[in-house]
Each structure stands twice: as structure tokens, then as C-alpha cells.
Amino acid sequence: IKAKLTVGITPILAEQLNDEHLKHGFVKYLDSRIAQVTKDLERYPDPKVAHSQHLKYLAKYYFDWFNHIKDSFVNKYGMDLIGEFKKYQDLGCIEITTSGATHGFSPLLATDSNLNAQFKVGSDTTKRLFGRKAKGCWLPECAYRQGYEYVGKDGKKHWRPAIEVTLQNNDIEYFFTESHVIEGGNSIGNRRVIGVYGNIEYIPLPERPATGYDTYSAYWLPDAQVAVMGRNDRAGYQVWSAADG
């Protein structure tokens, strides 16, 4: 079944999955977990330990769990997850998107050359590992920056192009960003619920008025022939929220 799914694999993750040291290290990690739960299987049930029958059940559960993962990784996928993703990409089941090479926070990168390097190296990495250039991109941390005018060190005014111009220069046709960029409003509410930064207080920012757009559609941008889509709040909560996911 060709699911027609978009799968975002950042260049950093792709390089890690392709690294031989990491592959064999993962197998060693699984072996160590299996060895630990094997000891627990031998230890329980123990009449001197409360709830030891349940501890036996848990040990068996994790024994099966880690062995299943190892069997899949080693025997089913041949320790080559990149190859498996590429296979389903080539079959037309999935489309793999790229991202910044080192997950650099795009709006804070000091120069356009820094920004371009992030997405050029990221795009080249995706092509090298998966055999084709990505058409789409997940912005690191979904962080977007529009074009703006600034005063340079020379005292003159300069124009800094929006992020999508750099993406277009690297043959990227669409990208994903945060929901409030599309819909308006404030991003603080989302960040208090979504992700690892949920308990950090933020300095309140002026709330943008509602735009009338939603995250169920893609939109062409005026500065480049690139489309943008926003991360859907409801789907984001289901994935990231510790309370609602």
C-alpha cells in the first residue's frame, strides 16, 4: 500500500542512522538491556519480594521487547534503516524531507551565507544518503523569519531576504513552520504544552491578529516560488503533549 506519507529525516539524524559506530553501539545497548532483564527473569518470582510475580511479568515483557527490536534491526533491516527508508521512497510510498545541516535556528543565523550553508549541506546530505534531492524541508524548531531591512556596519540600509529565498536557491519547493506563523496569534501557548520547553516561562510578545488562514492548506509565498505549511496544533498536541498526547 503506497501510503503517500511525508517523512521528515533531518540531516543529523540521517548521518547518525548511517554511522557504523552508532549501529553497532545500538546493538550493544540492546544486548546489555537483554542481559539485565535475563537476570530479572532468573531472580523472580521471589517470595521474599513484594509483588515479585508482577516483576516477573515485567521482566518477560521487556525481554521480549528488546529481543524483538534487536531481531528487527539486525535481521529484518540488516542494520540499515537509511536503506529501508530509501526503498520505500523509491517505491513511491513516502517522500523524505530535509532540514538544516546542524539544526541551526534559522532566524538567529548571523549571515545569509550561514543560512545558505545550513540548507545546502542539509540538502546535499539528504541527496547523498537517499539518492535524490529533497523537495521539502522542516525548518529547525519550525522557526521562520521574513525579509527585513537593517542597517549594516557600513551605516547603510540593506535588505535581508526571507528564509524561503534561501530555500528556493537550494531547490526546496515547500517547507513546514509553526502554526502561529500561518494563523496569527501567539506561539507561547503552544510552547507551554508542546516539546521539552513546556515549563519555561517566556517574555510575552505582542499577539498577532488572526490571519484567516489555517494549517490544512499550503500557501505560496510572495518572495519566492516556495509553498509553506504550518504544523497543526491538534496533531502537535497528540504527539508532543505529556498531558493530552
Task: Annotate each language-model stretch with its function.
Residues I1-G245:
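Carbohydrate-active enzymes and regulators
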